[in-house]
Amino acid sequence: MFLLYEYDIFWAFLIISSAIPVLAFFISGVLSPIRKGPEKLSSYESGIEPIGDAWLQFRIRYYMFALVFVVFDVETVFLYPWAMSFDVLGVSAFIEAFIFVLILILGLVYAWRKGALEWS
Protein backbone atom coordinates (compact mmCIF):
# COMPACT_ATOMS: atom_id res chain seq x y z
CA MET A 1 0.00 0.00 0.00
CA PHE A 2 1.25 3.45 -0.89
CA LEU A 3 1.52 5.58 2.23
CA LEU A 4 1.82 9.33 1.89
CA TYR A 5 3.16 9.97 5.36
CA GLU A 6 6.45 8.34 4.38
CA TYR A 7 7.11 11.32 2.10
CA ASP A 8 6.46 14.03 4.69
CA ILE A 9 10.15 14.78 5.11
CA PHE A 10 10.53 15.05 1.32
CA TRP A 11 7.67 17.53 0.99
CA ALA A 12 8.94 19.56 3.94
CA PHE A 13 12.40 19.72 2.37
CA LEU A 14 10.94 20.65 -1.02
CA ILE A 15 8.80 23.45 0.41
CA ILE A 16 11.58 24.89 2.56
CA SER A 17 14.19 24.70 -0.20
CA SER A 18 11.80 26.45 -2.59
CA ALA A 19 10.75 29.10 -0.09
CA ILE A 20 14.24 30.22 0.91
CA PRO A 21 15.30 31.62 -2.50
CA VAL A 22 11.88 33.18 -3.08
CA LEU A 23 12.04 34.89 0.32
CA ALA A 24 15.63 36.02 -0.30
CA PHE A 25 14.68 37.69 -3.59
CA PHE A 26 11.56 39.25 -2.08
CA ILE A 27 13.39 40.64 0.95
CA SER A 28 16.26 42.03 -1.15
CA GLY A 29 13.75 43.67 -3.49
CA VAL A 30 11.91 45.31 -0.62
CA LEU A 31 14.97 46.47 1.33
CA SER A 32 17.27 47.57 -1.50
CA PRO A 33 17.42 51.28 -2.28
CA ILE A 34 16.19 52.36 -5.69
CA ARG A 35 18.22 55.33 -6.90
CA LYS A 36 18.74 55.47 -10.64
CA GLY A 37 20.99 58.25 -11.74
CA PRO A 38 23.60 58.75 -14.43
CA GLU A 39 26.30 57.21 -12.22
CA LYS A 40 24.23 54.10 -11.60
CA LEU A 41 23.23 53.61 -15.23
CA SER A 42 26.72 54.01 -16.71
CA SER A 43 28.95 51.02 -17.32
CA TYR A 44 32.02 50.86 -15.15
CA GLU A 45 35.32 49.31 -16.17
CA SER A 46 38.36 49.65 -13.88
CA GLY A 47 37.48 53.20 -12.91
CA ILE A 48 37.87 54.47 -16.45
CA GLU A 49 34.98 55.96 -18.37
CA PRO A 50 34.17 53.60 -21.25
CA ILE A 51 34.64 54.77 -24.82
CA GLY A 52 32.56 53.37 -27.66
CA ASP A 53 29.82 50.81 -27.79
CA ALA A 54 29.59 48.00 -25.27
CA TRP A 55 28.46 45.46 -27.86
CA LEU A 56 31.49 43.83 -29.46
CA GLN A 57 31.48 40.86 -31.76
CA PHE A 58 33.80 38.02 -30.87
CA ARG A 59 35.09 35.55 -33.35
CA ILE A 60 33.46 32.14 -33.31
CA ARG A 61 36.82 30.46 -32.72
CA TYR A 62 36.77 31.39 -29.03
CA TYR A 63 33.41 29.68 -28.59
CA MET A 64 34.51 26.64 -30.59
CA PHE A 65 37.67 26.32 -28.50
CA ALA A 66 35.63 26.45 -25.29
CA LEU A 67 33.08 23.99 -26.64
CA VAL A 68 35.75 21.48 -27.66
CA PHE A 69 37.35 21.82 -24.22
CA VAL A 70 34.04 21.21 -22.43
CA VAL A 71 33.18 18.21 -24.58
CA PHE A 72 36.51 16.48 -23.98
CA ASP A 73 36.58 17.47 -20.33
CA VAL A 74 33.14 15.96 -19.71
CA GLU A 75 33.93 12.83 -21.71
CA THR A 76 36.99 12.08 -19.61
CA VAL A 77 34.75 12.02 -16.53
CA PHE A 78 33.09 8.93 -17.99
CA LEU A 79 36.44 7.11 -17.88
CA TYR A 80 36.79 7.45 -14.10
CA PRO A 81 34.22 4.79 -13.05
CA TRP A 82 35.68 2.43 -15.62
CA ALA A 83 39.17 2.96 -14.24
CA MET A 84 38.01 2.35 -10.67
CA SER A 85 36.43 -1.02 -11.52
CA PHE A 86 38.80 -2.12 -14.27
CA ASP A 87 39.90 -5.33 -12.54
CA VAL A 88 36.29 -6.50 -11.99
CA LEU A 89 34.84 -5.73 -15.43
CA GLY A 90 37.03 -7.89 -17.62
CA VAL A 91 38.11 -7.83 -21.25
CA SER A 92 34.78 -6.68 -22.75
CA ALA A 93 34.84 -3.49 -20.68
CA PHE A 94 38.42 -2.87 -21.76
CA ILE A 95 37.41 -3.19 -25.42
CA GLU A 96 34.45 -0.84 -24.90
CA ALA A 97 36.66 1.75 -23.17
CA PHE A 98 39.24 1.41 -25.93
CA ILE A 99 36.55 2.12 -28.55
CA PHE A 100 35.34 5.09 -26.46
CA VAL A 101 38.85 6.56 -26.28
CA LEU A 102 39.34 5.90 -30.00
CA ILE A 103 36.16 7.88 -30.79
CA LEU A 104 37.45 10.71 -28.58
CA ILE A 105 40.77 10.72 -30.43
CA LEU A 106 39.00 10.77 -33.79
CA GLY A 107 36.92 13.75 -32.60
CA LEU A 108 40.05 15.54 -31.45
CA VAL A 109 41.77 14.94 -34.80
CA TYR A 110 38.66 16.20 -36.62
CA ALA A 111 38.54 19.37 -34.49
CA TRP A 112 42.26 19.88 -35.01
CA ARG A 113 41.99 19.58 -38.80
CA LYS A 114 39.02 21.96 -38.92
CA GLY A 115 41.08 24.55 -37.02
CA ALA A 116 38.90 24.64 -33.92
CA LEU A 117 41.96 24.34 -31.67
CA GLU A 118 43.82 27.36 -33.06
CA TRP A 119 43.52 30.36 -30.81
CA SER A 120 44.47 33.21 -33.15
UniProtKB/Swiss-Prot annotation:
Reactions that this protein is recorded to catalyse: a plastoquinone + NADH + (n+1) H(+)(in) = a plastoquinol + NAD(+) + n H(+)(out); a plastoquinone + NADPH + (n+1) H(+)(in) = a plastoquinol + NADP(+) + n H(+)(out)
Gene Ontology molecular function: any one: quinone binding
Domain of life: Eukaryota
InterPro entries: NAD(P)H_OxRDtase_bac/plastid (IPR023043), NADH_UbQ/plastoQ_OxRdtase_su3 (IPR000440), NDAH_ubi_oxred_su3_sf (IPR038430)
UniProt keywords, alphabetically: Chloroplast, Membrane, NAD, NADP, Plastid, Plastoquinone, Quinone, Thylakoid, Translocase, Transmembrane, Transmembrane helix, Transport
Intracellular or extracellular location(s): Plastid, Chloroplast thylakoid membrane
Transmembrane parts of this sequence: 9-29, 64-84, 88-108
One GO-annotated biological process of the protein: photosynthesis, light reaction
EC class of the enzyme, as a word: translocase
Keyword Protein biosynthesis: no
EC nos: 7.1.1.-
A cellular component annotation (GO) from this entry: NADH dehydrogenase complex
Keyword Plastid assigned: yes
Membrane topology of the entry: Multi-pass membrane protein
Family as reported in the entry's similarity comment: Belongs to the complex I subunit 3 family.
Alphabetized PANTHER family for the sequence: NADH-UBIQUINONE OXIDOREDUCTASE CHAIN 3 (PTHR11058:SF9)
Reported function: NDH shuttles electrons from NAD(P)H:plastoquinone, via FMN and iron-sulfur (Fe-S) centers, to quinones in the photosynthetic chain and possibly in a chloroplast respiratory chain. The immediate electron acceptor for the enzyme in this species is believed to be plastoquinone. Couples the redox reaction to proton translocation, and thus conserves the redox energy in a proton gradient.
Assembly: NDH is composed of at least 16 different subunits, 5 of which are encoded in the nucleus.
Name used for this protein in its record: NAD(P)H-quinone oxidoreductase subunit 3, chloroplastic
Lineage of source species: Eukaryota, Viridiplantae, Streptophyta, Embryophyta, Tracheophyta
